[in-house]
Amino acid sequence: MAEHPEEVGLNSMRRVAQDAGVKPATITRLTKILGFPQYDALREPFRQRLRTRSPEFASKLQHVQNLSESDEDSLFADLRAQEISNVQHSLSDENYPHMDAAAQIMNDSRRVYVLGLRGAYAPAFLFHYAYQLFQDNSQLLDTRAGMFADQLRGIGPEDSLLVISFSPYAQHTIDAVEYAAEAGAKIVAVTDSIVSPAASAAAHTIVTKNQSPSFYHSFTGALAVVQALITLLVTKAGGDAVKIVEEAEKQLSRISAYW
């Protein structure tokens, strides 16, 4: 538990016991020995740590500034290598079955809800924009005008939610995941860990690397996954998708959308 505090904060007692290779009764006994009335009370400090963990952007920024003063070429080389690694990991053979299954879930959905807040809004918007060019059943969730809860109204078992989220996880994102799960929607999570709260109820989790030598985490891996999902969805879309794209192109041409 000391070595894997995130798992304790996010998972049930049965799951923690399974991962530790012990029976649930062992965790129950440990809970009482430590003076907690029940497992939820033992788990609360671990959950609190997850909620209050600081992203430490300021200290990382200072570190980058110190590096750049001494060796900008080395910093750029490290950045390039890390971004390449992020993409390679995200588009790995291990991730492909999860991406293909996730695309099938969304292809079979009545409605596809798309969610990414704060920094994760960019890959979420890219997915929504590309997807709506050949399908008409996408709903991009956001917090504008306080309409977040309204946008989720009606989500159910015939729908899916694509959620993109990385530590530090936005509270509205986790709330939406929990709501969608309770409503029976199928969740596809693009996130940084299999124990991410965004993946707690996911049918499929696509883990992407987001490390960066810069002060802010990278979304290059998430963008690569979005591109892969869109490509897979196009292959599953059928002939109607071509007609929808043709109509979209005509409409954009009529309003002179492009220079």
What label would you give each PLM region?
Residues 3-10, 14-98:
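HTH-adjacent hinge/linker in prokaryotic transcriptional regulators
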Residues 15, 41, 101-104, 122, ...:
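Amphipathic alpha-helical interaction segments
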Residues 104-224, 228-237:
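Glycine-rich phosphate-binding loops that contact phosphosugars or nucleotide phosphates
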